[in-house]
Amino acid sequence: MSGTKYIFVTGGVVSSIGKGTSAAALGMLLKSRGYRVVLQKFDPYINVDPGTMNPYQHGEVFVTEDGAETDLDLGHYERFLDENLGRLSNVTTGSVYWEVISRERRGDYLGATVQVIPHITNEIKARIGRLGREKDVVITEIGGTVGDIESQPFLEAIRQFRNDVGRKNVLYVHVSYVPYIEAAGELKTKPTQHSTQRLREMGISPDILICRADRPIGEEIRRKIALFGDVEVDSVIPAQDAPTLYDIPLSLHGSGLDALVLEKLGLPAPPARLEEWRGLVRRLHGAEREVRVAVIGKYIRLQDAYLSVVEALRHAGGAHEVRVELDWVDSEQISDPEAARERLRGADGVLVLHGFGQRGIEGKIEAARYARESGTPYLGLCLGMQIAVIEFARNVAGLEMANSTEFDEETPHPVIDIMPDQVGVEMGGTMRLGSYPCRLRPGTLAARVYGAEVVHERHRHRYEVNNAYREVLEEAGMVFSGTSPDGRLVEIAELAGHPFFIGSQFHPEFKSRPLRPHPLFRGFVGACLGAAEEAGRVTAPAAGRKDGASG
């Protein structure tokens, strides 16, 4: 363990200031210098995992290759590192207590009084150590804000960890917010001063401060922060809001963050290889064309609920050198055909999102119908594929009132039904989760888009296409172009004769990377561009528009 270096990223003042993207960007920069890096997120909530949490409270549930339901920050980590992470990369208070209490019940502690210190903190430290095997650098983000009562066991654990592995092997990075007060006309350092002071009260003295602001942080402000934060001026790294997420690594590299980290850890600093990343950013900023995609969902008030989809579309747009304008559509507002036609008319593509529960389902069905009848490119994700099957069954195959048993247990035509091995099982860790192989049918759209015979994709669902209806649906013109290797489970459905109409039972967005856009998203955006060009709708992006990303 002593050969591995550990970096702990904490946050102060307010939440959502960019700890996750800062940690991911630092990991990407260290990897670009040749280091083997892994990232980890500590979430201080008592839920065992976010699998059953409301998306409006938590945002997206990101699924890893090994089937863990995790925090959305793991999506940032994977996209920036371009590597798959596993369940050890997300640790919650609930999972830690679950393990410790299970050991106590088994008698593993030999009758000892089980306490936060040392039992909980030891379990936290063990999870850090296990992740560090075979890696040069472990970067661990501590969720929440310094001062939160929920985070205290994690902060105590990382304080102890420095003594456990040697002080030269641990670095503390604190991300703070420097607000601009309009009335005073200046940036204020007091919140950062109090944040670092609170951290020191817990026994942790930050080695580096990353200071978020909406404008440049001048030398005078940096000196003031350094004075009260007890760090060198060079260790105060300014992080101004960036036009896109993918500008952040280049911005932090320009501020010297990665070089400073290596210096403080006593590691060599080979040159950073950032040519491909710079090319990506140039393509994102240089897009001279724009396409509009109607995105149909029911949690659209919080776009973090679909974060990986947004990023996958951005990756595909970069590959085609177009900006993808997202038109968010509440599925409850388009539940009749006329409303759907009026709302979706002029869209270059229709994307129906995943989700659970009955609310907004009829609107999603009408969106699929509009795309099918108008020839508009369509991409359905998980439930979005099931929706396409239901719509086709009702309106093409003649299966009146066809539905999923998730929404109507009495439907006469359950074209979507629960998997047999899930009947009677409680929610929480019971779905088909993680990576599974998918065999593609030669000559189909799916096979052309992927350019492969077998692919591996990540799943998160309980319901499947009912095999009892596959033959009648295929006879009506639906093509099941991807299945499990044994042919029992439908993975991809598409329509013959349509320019681009495809749905996946899996979640392709989880495997899209900035430099390697997912084939389904790349194909979809390409089809949207073709539709826009044919209709004469390709436009230039609006001047000065940002995607809302920050560092």
UniProtKB/Swiss-Prot annotation:
Q: How is its activity regulated?
A: Allosterically activated by GTP, when glutamine is the substrate; GTP has no effect on the reaction when ammonia is the substrate. The allosteric effector GTP functions by stabilizing the protein conformation that binds the tetrahedral intermediate(s) formed during glutamine hydrolysis. Inhibited by the product CTP, via allosteric rather than competitive inhibition.
Record: active site:
382, 507, 509
The lineage's top-level taxon is Bacteria
**What does the UniProt keyword field contain?**
ATP-binding, Glutamine amidotransferase, Ligase, Magnesium, Metal-binding, Nucleotide-binding, Pyrimidine biosynthesis
Task: Specify which residues bind Mg(2+) according to the UniProt entry for this protein.
Answer: 73, 141
- Give the Glutamine amidotransferase type-1 domain ranges: 292-534
- Give me the residues that bind UTP, please: 15, 188-193, 224
Q: Name one Pfam family in it.
A: GATase
- Give one GO biological process term: pyrimidine nucleobase biosynthetic process
Binding residues for L-glutamine, per the UniProt record? 56, 355, 383-386, 406, 462
Q: Which family does it belong to?
A: Belongs to the CTP synthase family.
Record's function text: Catalyzes the ATP-dependent amination of UTP to CTP with either L-glutamine or ammonia as the source of nitrogen. Regulates intracellular CTP levels through interactions with the four ribonucleotide triphosphates.
Its recorded name reads CTP synthase
Q: What organism does the record attribute this protein to?
A: Rubrobacter xylanophilus (strain DSM 9941 / JCM 11954 / NBRC 16129 / PRD-1)
Which taxonomic lineage does the organism of this UniProt entry have?
Answer: Bacteria, Bacillati, Actinomycetota, Rubrobacteria, Rubrobacterales
Gene encoding it?
A: pyrG
